[in-house]
């Protein structure tokens, strides 16, 4: 045997193509359409539905189904980031509550001012009941007890189950792992351990509905609590002509039809009539 040998390399895996990550080819400078976070979520659901198309019994369709499940959960996370950012820009109480939160030096240097609040959320996730409630409280000063709001509590529980499904797709190539099976209910799901997720069109639509229900429930809760929190300030007159400057920005943040003037008037009147303003 020779004293000096070149390192053994079998190349058992076969031929490979040399490739280097070039970040410049993945992004474009585009101007996003200014719309409300809930409207953007609904539009994303519609887009994902079109991408999924008609159900068929093929690996290709099931792969698309898995990918749109990841996409809709991502849409929920994007909703929370966007709504928190928009509220921090517009609502004085929320902004004051977030003064103590930290943002990276790089974000301060390079973020546009209207996007800077979103940099606060870089280390946050919105894939469980605990983290969603914690982040809404930490950044907006809204302490929400879901046990007092059955519809919201149910929406959070269902979404958390969807997130376990998403975890299997994103991190285990669509196979059900033991940890996720335990969270979903091991007695019920033990027979599916290490077996592939096989979604149907109905099951994907069920995931879409669960995600949308959570977004709509939270959208209502955050709007209601912010506007109720403002009442003691005595800023509302009961006359939309006088209150439009304050009410319109809030309506535009939370409404799925932010440019609908009839809905604006209806929402304002519902608020003032309820509180006798």
What are these regions (language model features)?
Residues 55-165:
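Helix-loop junctions and short alpha-helical segments
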Residues 47, 71, 161-168, 206, ...:
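Charged, amphipathic alpha-helical oligomerization/scaffolding segments
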